[in-house]
Amino acid sequence: MVRVAINGFGRIGRLVMRIALSRPNVEVVALNDPFITNDYAAYMFKYDSTHGRYAGEVSHDDKHIIVDGKKIATYQERDPANLPWGSSNVDIAIDSTGVFKELDTAQKHIDAGAKKVVITAPSSTAPMFVMGVNEEKYTSDLKIVSNASCTTNCLAPLAKVINDAFGIEEGLMTTVHSLTATQKTVDGPSHKDWRGGRTASGNIIPSSTGAAKAVGKVLPELQGKLTGMAFRVPTVDVSVVDLTVKLNKETTYDEIKKVVKAAAEGKLKGVLGYTEDAVVSSDFLGDSHSSIFDASAGIQLSPKFVKLVSWYDNEYGYSTRVVDLVEHVAKA
């Protein structure tokens, strides 16, 4: 049984808790969010506009939220170093604030007494692991790790399968990405990203993403071979990766489908999905895969040049992998 604490009770923090509570080998012992009172934390956990109402019982008292009779201690500390992770016997702190995502800042959880930290955001200093891609490289001496981003979790398994079978010479990725909490409901100030300050619900907004370059960190053989961008679109959840690649080996689209399907039914089962149905984004709400290859959406121009399409629930699929990584780290 791994004892976890969650820091940051936003979109990812709340879904991570839902998923963790369903795992027999994971015990959620505490959560911290300096901006949320216990009654509000219980309310937000119970009601979710995207993923629906929590099926069990949720209540609270002065020091806990109570889920299905289980008491989870709550704290409102701004500085993670002040949290009682040592006295709470926290094995792994899950940091889903998006703030403490580098080795020096995530170290605060270790200083507070947690044995290890899993960051639910890409990191430029902490080692990144993508389940199904490079988690076997994790060693128990690593105290702080990152689960990378939702888009990297979608792209990396597909890129690995394609690169292993055909070789990727180079590629460009576009993610058509649902809106997130960083965006604005109406035009507002956004000094570092002017486009990002425009109304989220009424625009298609070009944006940057480091997801494709990050694939090179989890798959060194693809370092420098992929880059990408994003379009933020007015859907609440589920995104889609468009990966256009030049291959080293000539192949057919049917052969690509066979290879991806075999991986989805084999070594990447549960991480990579496969469909030939005429699907749209809402069909993947609540899908726990990192990446679902859409076989009927891709196209091929020539034997070495293809466009591949893969869906992901950028909230639920990613949060599922966070808990998978927590369990993997705990076992190592």
Swiss-Prot record:
Q: Where is the active site?
A: C150 (nucleophile)
Could you tell me which residues carry Cysteine persulfide? C150, C154
Superkingdom, natural source: Eukaryota
Q: What induces it?
A: Expression is not affected by a heat shock.
Q: Name one GO molecular function term.
A: RNA binding
In which pathway is this protein known to take part? Carbohydrate degradation; glycolysis; pyruvate from D-glyceraldehyde 3-phosphate: step 1/5
Q: Which residues carry this modification: Phosphoserine?
A: S302
Identify the GO cellular component terms for this protein: cytoplasm; cytosol; fungal-type cell wall; lipid droplet; mitochondrion; nucleus; plasma membrane
> Is Mitochondrion included in the keywords of this UniProt record?
yes
Cross-link Glycyl lysine isopeptide (Lys-Gly) (interchain with G-Cter in URM1) mapped to chain: K160, K307
Q: Which residues bind NAD(+)?
A: R11, I12, D33, T120, N314, Y318
* Chain sites annotated for binding D-glyceraldehyde 3-phosphate: S149, C150, T151, T180, T209, G210, R232
Q: What happens when the gene is disrupted?
A: Does not affect growth when ethanol is used as carbon source but reduces growth when glucose is used as carbon source.
Which UniProt key words apply to this protein?
Answer: Cytoplasm, Glycolysis, Isopeptide bond, Mitochondrion, NAD, Oxidoreductase, Phosphoprotein, Ubl conjugation
PTM annotation = Conjugated to URM1, a ubiquitin-like protein, in response to oxidative stresses. The attachment of URM1 to lysine residues exclusively depends on the presence of a peroxidatic cysteine in the target protein, with low specificity for the particular residue, motif, or structural context at which urmylation can occur. The URM1-conjugation reaction is mechanistically and directly coupled to the process of cysteine persulfidation, transfering the sulfur atom of the URM1 thiocarboxyl group to redox-active cysteine residues in the target protein if it is exposed to oxidative conditions. Persulfidated on specific redox-active cysteine residues. Persulfidation (also called protein S-sulfhydration) may provide a molecular mechanism that enables cells to protect vulnerable cysteine residues from reactive oxygen species (ROS) under stress conditions.
Q: Report the NCBIfam families cross-referenced here.
A: GAPDH-I
Similarity remark: Belongs to the glyceraldehyde-3-phosphate dehydrogenase family.
Q: What else is known?
A: Present with 169000 molecules/cell in log phase SD medium.
Q: What does this protein do?
A: Glyceraldehyde-3-phosphate dehydrogenase (GAPDH) involved in glycolysis and gluconeogenesis. Catalyzes the reaction of glyceraldehyde-3-phosphate to 1,3 bis-phosphoglycerate. The contribution of the TDH1, TDH2, and TDH3 to the total glyceraldehyde-3-phosphate dehydrogenase activity is 10-15, 25-30, and 50-60%, respectively. As a side activity, catalyzes the hydration of the nicotinamide ring of NADH or NADPH at the C6 position to give the corresponding hydrates, NADHX and NADPHX, which exist as R and S epimers, that cannot act as electron donors or acceptors and inhibit several dehydrogenases, making them toxic.
State the name under which the record lists this protein: Glyceraldehyde-3-phosphate dehydrogenase 3
